[in-house]
Design a protein with these regions (language model features):
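Glycine- and aromatic-enriched mobile tails/lids
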Residues: 1-169
């Protein structure tokens, strides 16, 4: 009920022809690609490498390794192909689009984890086992600039009912 009310009352940004054109181009590029890379194989490699190098318990060394793996996977993603060229109910196209988004999110996650030199919540750096509120009690906003570099901005954490304290088990 709350989601429906929010959707009804929300102020949406206008969808421009430029945005539609970018989306159409991405779809057509995938449908017309004659590359040899298969979406399922790339997705499986992404899943396994993220589990091996960027799951809850991480080190800078493993995260750096994953950065390189992601570069390779993103390069290979440019050479994917799909068999279904249709416009209706094309689940293969949806999976190809989703893989592209997964690669982008993985890149932001790995760079953010590498940048954050502490452990906090589900982000456990074995090479930085302590929480560092002085330097890292903030939200990380990752974004890409035109040259492909991942950059960061930060937003303060608003404390209230729950103050940070050491975990004791």
């Amino acid at each position: 009920i709350h989601a429906a009310r929010f959707a009804r009352d929300a102020d949406y940004h206008e969808l421009t022809e430029e945005h539609l054109g970018e989306s159409r181009e991405r779809i057509e590029r995938i449908k017309n690609s004659t590359g040899k890379e298969k979406v399922a194989a790339l997705r499986a490699e992404l899943q396994q490498s993220m589990m091996d190098n960027a799951s809850v318990f991480r080190t800078g060394e493993l995260l750096k390794k994953q950065v390189e793996i992601l570069k390779e996977l993103m390069d290979r993603y440019k050479r994917i192909s799909i068999d279904d060229k249709g416009d209706a109910y094309n689940t293969e196209l949806v999976e190809a689009l989703e893989l592209g988004y997964l690669l982008e999110v993985s890149e932001a996650l790995v760079h953010s984890a590498l940048n954050r030199t502490e452990s906090r919540g589900a982000h456990a750096r074995e090479d930085y086992p302590e929480r560092d509120d002085e330097n890292w009690l903030k939200h990380t906003l990752a974004y890409k600039v035109e040259d492909g570099k991942v950059c960061f901005r930060y937003k303060p954490v608003v404390l209230g009912r729950f103050e940070p304290k050491p975990r004791t088990y």
